Amino acid sequence: MSLDRNMSHKVYNFDQVIDRHHTHSFKWDNVTYPANSDMLPMPVADMDFVVADEILVALDQITSHGILGYSIVPETLKEAAQSKIARDYKWSTSLDSQVWIPGIVPGITAACAALTNEKEGIITAVPVYHPFHLVAGWVNCPLITFEMIKDGDRWTFDFEDFERGLQKGPKVFLLCNPHNPGGTVFNESEIKRIVELCAKYHVTIVSDEIHADLRLRAASEHISIGRFEQQPIISFFATSKAFNTAGLGGAVAIIPDAALRDKFIKASNGFFSMLSRHSIEVMLATYAFGEPWLNQLLPYLQANHDLLYDFVQSTPGLAMQPLEATYLAWIEYDEAILGDFQKKCWNAGLHVLRGEQFKGRNFVRLNFACPRSVLEKAINRMKSITNG
């Protein structure tokens, strides 16, 4: 596939509003929305921005070729992922350690199916991305949770509570780094402590690192769990979240230990689909050409974050920690002041996710990866609630 490198000089317009209605959008065409409503949907973690031109060209070239058969994962894609992980996350991996999969949630499910049983299950911190706690039911294993805590202006682990949970005998620790919904990019000392504790109790770390490229101003670098590996681990990476191609799927599991890798592959037999050619070519284009688009996106997201943060911090009954990564604001509300804030948002025409979905009471999660005019409209709808 041939792409024009001159595209990298383009200035992208993230203020452009694209109508996503009637595109089968999971976010915008939600069947539960009132008919003909002006609902602003801010629950689902995809972005309302047009992707990089090189991605669109890659898709056009596939379509013009006209054949959409089965595909293999080319060496060029494996090498591109390996290079990115080494360059951006400072982790040297082998090509043999890669297992290409349709998505990270199926990968997490396969990992838990491979490593747990009816008596020895999963431990994870809460609040957390909901598949992390739902997967225990999917694979029929116990779930142990421990609470995240506020440390100054960021969320982190209560490591004493974490160790108490590890003492109960789980087989897998599910880590979300950067954290969804807390927005934390775990620092080196935190990552080392996680690795040390899991090694002490012989617990395999399964790490979802899909938000690694969505670091905002407060975060200097993403530290992958693999940099301090003391025992077998599974780390998942994907370009889909940061480059807004989630609908195409595609991810890679890095599993350096051969025996663990074999277990993972056997557990996934029968329910992983092959990667489509669309997914493969888009990932290749993203690895090769996506960085200029991302470099323009991140300051725009930071400005959106700051606009929302300033509103929240100035509003009685609302609070949030400034995010280090992601575009998913985790907003706390005082029920005594605001009542059922999520329901009031819905009634005002704003759809945000209820915190209980992540095991966090009196919170909502709001996706601010949208044109600024749309975010301003959402803030005005929240003002109509909080000023009333």
Q: Would you name each region that the model predicts?
A:
Residues 8-103, 110, 388:
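N-terminal small-domain helix-loop-helix segment of the aminotransferase-like
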Residues 57-58, 231-302:
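Conserved core segment of the aminotransferase class I/II
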Residues 68-196, 213-214, 220-227, 234:
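Conserved core of the PLP fold type I
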Residues 94-95, 322-328, 359-361:
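Short Gly/Ser/Thr- and Asp/Glu-enriched loop/turn motifs at secondary-structure junctions
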Residues 139, 200-201, 315, 348:
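Helix C-cap/helix->beta junction micro-motif
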Residues 163, 337, 343-353, 357-388:
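PLP-dependent enzyme catalytic core of the Aspartate aminotransferase-like
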Residues 284, 300-309, 320-332:
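Conserved glycine-rich beta-strand-loop-beta hairpin in the small C-terminal domain of fold type I
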